């Protein structure tokens, strides 16, 4: 089995720029056991290079399939170095701390050596088989050094041909996942689920669209669903799924208010609520509408009990 060329030390790369290898453990979605990988040059090795290395450990029938690398809930972009994608700390903190002197000053014995923990990378193996051209394109961006060499090759031609500046804005929201290997249909399905979550606690006229929707998607991808559930401390204008998912858990700050006011309105003002809902459809969220219905049922129950007694 041959290993990709980018794993061997490059004479043009300064080896002192990193403090040690990056220890990874690859976990597959298929029934393939985990295996460890040591990346010698994480500052120049990209996610595409990691895919090339993973392919050498896969069975022959899976080595050409499309791979997706996920770390901490985010897809790794092929052309980005691992040190940037994984948000690694500076190199001195990644290396094991080994003391030069075996004994401490006051005769306390040998100091323990802290081993560097391994990072877990989830690898999803798709059903699509990549062509030779796709595999060659993936290998071409295996390291940043190869990208720099390719850039130097056509720098002169770019100077001669001055194209007009592109007005296309950078992808925002879930469109950023397209560069990580997701298909347009998968991005569309994810956006549909996100809109369904938002529609639970929003009326049709307050649903986010355009730039506001992309901003919500960016915030969800950057901060993660756990951070969104925790809310934004110190401000009342932050958007979080805990406030807007329409749930009834302890994390929903507006759930109790909606249930209380909805039940009170349904109990004391059932006819007015019915006329209001008839004239302005979608004025309440699903949660408050359910609370109003509960209040009306309680009103009817109390009236029936009074008539029977």
Swiss-Prot record:
Disruption phenotype: Impairs growth on solid media under hypoxia and leads to triazole susceptibility. Impairs virulence in a murine model of invasive pulmonary aspergillosis (IPA). It holds the Pfam family Dsc3_N. It comes from the Eukaryota. GO terms for cellular component: Dsc E3 ubiquitin ligase complex; endoplasmic reticulum membrane. It is a multi-pass membrane protein. The chain crosses the membrane at residues 257-277, 289-309. It is found in: Endoplasmic reticulum membrane. Glycans are attached at residue 61. Keywords: Endoplasmic reticulum, Glycoprotein, Membrane, Transmembrane, Transmembrane helix, Ubl conjugation pathway. Pathway: Protein modification; protein ubiquitination. Residues 88-110, 148-177 are annotated as: Disordered. Belongs to the dsc3 family. Component of the DSC E3 ubiquitin ligase complex which is required for the srbA transcriptional activator proteolytic cleavage to release the soluble transcription factor from the membrane in low oxygen or sterol conditions. Required for growth during hypoxia and triazole drug susceptibility, as well as for virulence in a murine model of invasive pulmonary aspergillosis (IPA). Component of the DSC E3 ubiquitin ligase complex composed of dscA, dscB, dscC and dscD. PANTHER family: DSC E3 UBIQUITIN LIGASE COMPLEX SUBUNIT 3, TRANSMEMBRANE PROTEIN YOR223W. This is DSC E3 ubiquitin ligase complex subunit C.
């Amino acid at each position: 089995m041959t290993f990709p060329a980018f794993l061997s030390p490059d004479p043009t790369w300064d080896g002192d720029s990193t403090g040690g290898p990056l220890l990874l453990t690859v976990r597959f979605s298929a029934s393939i056991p985990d295996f460890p990988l040591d990346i010698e040059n994480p500052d120049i090795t990209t996610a595409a290079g990691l895919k090339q290395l993973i392919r050498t450990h896969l069975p022959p029938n899976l080595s050409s399939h499309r791979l997706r690398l996920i770390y901490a809930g985010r897809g790794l972009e092929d052309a980005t170095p691992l040190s940037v994608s994984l948000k690694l700390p500076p190199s001195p903190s990644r290396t094991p701390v080994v003391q030069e002197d075996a004994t401490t000053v006051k005769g306390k014995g040998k100091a323990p050596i802290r081993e560097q923990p391994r990072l877990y990378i989830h690898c999803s193996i798709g059903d699509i088989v990549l062509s030779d051209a796709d595999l060659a394109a993936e290998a071409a961006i295996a390291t940043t050094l190869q990208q720099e060499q390719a850039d130097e090759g056509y720098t002169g031609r770019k100077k001669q041909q001055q194209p007009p500046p592109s007005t296309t804005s950078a992808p925002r929201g879930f469109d950023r996942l397209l560069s990580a290997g997701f298909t347009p249909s998968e991005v569309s399905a994810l956006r549909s689920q996100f809109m369904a979550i938002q529609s639970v606690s929003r009326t049709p006229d307050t649903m986010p669209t355009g730039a506001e929707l992309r901003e919500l998607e960016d915030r969800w991808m950057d901060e993660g669903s756990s951070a969104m559930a925790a809310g934004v401390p110190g401000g009342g204008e932050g958007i979080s799924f805990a406030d807007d998912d329409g749930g009834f858990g302890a994390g929903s700050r507006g759930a109790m208010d909606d249930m209380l006011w909805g039940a009170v309105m349904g109990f004391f003002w059932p006819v007015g609520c019915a006329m209001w809902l008839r004239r302005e459809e979608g004025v309440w969220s699903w949660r408050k509408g359910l609370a109003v219905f509960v209040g009306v049922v309680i009103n009817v129950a109390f009236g029936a009990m009074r008539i029977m007694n």
